Amino acid sequence: MTGTTRATRRTDSHPDLADPRVGAPFFSTWRVGTPLRQRRSVEAVAAAWERRPWPADDLLGYHVYTGHDASTLLHYSQWTSEQAYEAFARTRRQERVDEIDTAVPDIERLGLTRYRHYRSGGPADRGGRVPGCIVIVDVEFEGPDSARQHAWVDAVFEALAHEPAPHPGGISAHFHLSTDGTRVLNYAEWDSAQSHLDALSAPGDGIGSATALWERVQTWPGLKSTTVSRYDHALGLVPD
């Protein structure tokens, strides 16, 4: 970890999931129980971070999202390396955790998963579109298999390339592979939650049309489960 004296600044800007500097993207989930505790937890995170200097040059950004289930928070941090995160965890993480837990007791932390960014898709020119909803698609496979992770994502991109009726509400999709070889996480940006719901209600299973390519994606050997969750971007923290 490199030393820094930069301040911590709050931002409303969404993160760049495809930033090539991000060598170690981490996702984690907290269960806090109610919309009020969601809001209080977000403010507790902001307070614990903003009162302290930015912890490391190797941390590019930290973002928090409120789940549409009215119970959970998603956390996404952009590290240049796992080693940089480990140094932060040893020396600077606990003081923040303690302050947050004092403000909002009984947070259930459901674990942190380490990923690597693999592929992103979407129009080269977003036309200034700002995401109104973040959709997280969490795919779990039966056991570790890096080749299967890559092949499945490639199959998704092939199905998208031949999609006969792409939904206009989708802005981008950013696929991440867990370092343990068992999961794929798609961080998808949509213009609104309603657009995503409309896409799910269209003919076909999921957001894709009823094509052979999408059926191959959905029946991939070793595919164990798929979970879809919607979030709002609630807090961005970056170095000043």
Which residues make up each language-model segment?
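Short S/T/G/P-rich N-terminal loop/turn motif that feeds into the first structured element of a domain
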Residues: 1-76, 80-240
